[in-house]
């Protein structure tokens, strides 16, 4: 009964490590504890979201650990995300710390951009999470004959794609949200609303991966594990 059975809900399993040495000091701890959180969760986002492209604050900087699921990467997001929420957005699209001109992540999710029939996603680096859902999407795209390219995507290219009509979809992917469609983004005070398209990739990818997760289809990749 503790494991949710509603569609979109799940038992979120998250391993973590924290320092336990009985001392307060400016040095790494000599003792740590490993634990696993098992938490029932509902659907992260129930509908498409609006995001703000960040121009001032940064999630991670080169030379850091933005690629990892580390608590410090989340703490720095809280304040700018609250500002974005007060402005009518649900999440922030993070940009590179050096120039704020290249998109990196959407909230706590990796981000995908569809220009024409091609999907683009930023390559992983020390500032971009090496997400397991991102890896899964790249695998599914290959088998679904969806062309995908890993390369930096600038804010200017995103806006140009919107203006020319080449921008078809924008969505984030992650373990909590799975696939979260973005139907509006804001940049420098201007709002850009993305119209629905025929044969969208985001719901197809979400259905494909959730069907595998829920055992509705075969798992040719060996992604499912029985938890006892």
Where in the sequence are the language-model features?
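Helix-start/capping segments and mature chain N-termini
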Residues: 16-19, 23-228
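Short, glycine/charge-rich beta-strand/loop segments that flank catalytic centers
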Residues: 4-22
């Amino acid at each position: 009964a503790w494991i949710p059975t509603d569609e979109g809900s799940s038992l979120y399993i998250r391993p973590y490590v924290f320092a336990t040495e009985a001392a307060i000091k400016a040095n790494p701890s000599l003792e740590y504890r490993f634990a696993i959180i098992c938490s029932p969760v509902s659907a992260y986002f129930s509908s498409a979201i609006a995001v703000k492209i960040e121009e001032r604050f940064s999630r991670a900087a080169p030379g850091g650990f933005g690629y990892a699921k580390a608590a410090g990467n989340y703490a720095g997001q809280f304040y700018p995300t609250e500002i974005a929420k007060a402005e009518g957005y649900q999440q922030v699209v993070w940009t590179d710390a050096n120039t704020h001109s290249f998109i990196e992540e959407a909230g706590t999710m990796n981000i995908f951009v569809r220009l024409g029939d091609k999907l683009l996603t930023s390559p992983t680096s020390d500032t971009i999470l090496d997400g397991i859902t991102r890896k899964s999407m790249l695998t599914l795209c290959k088998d679904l004959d969806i062309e995908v390219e890993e390369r930096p995507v600038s804010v200017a290219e995103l806006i140009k794609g919107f203006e020319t009509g080449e921008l078809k979809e924008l969505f984030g992917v992650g373990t909590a949200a799975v696939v979260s469609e973005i139907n509006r983004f804001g940049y420098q005070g201007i709002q850009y609303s993305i119209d629905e398209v025929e044969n969208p990739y985001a719901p197809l990818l979400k259905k494909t991966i959730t069907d595998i997760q829920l055992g509705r289809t075969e798992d040719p990749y060996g992604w499912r594990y029985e938890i006892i």
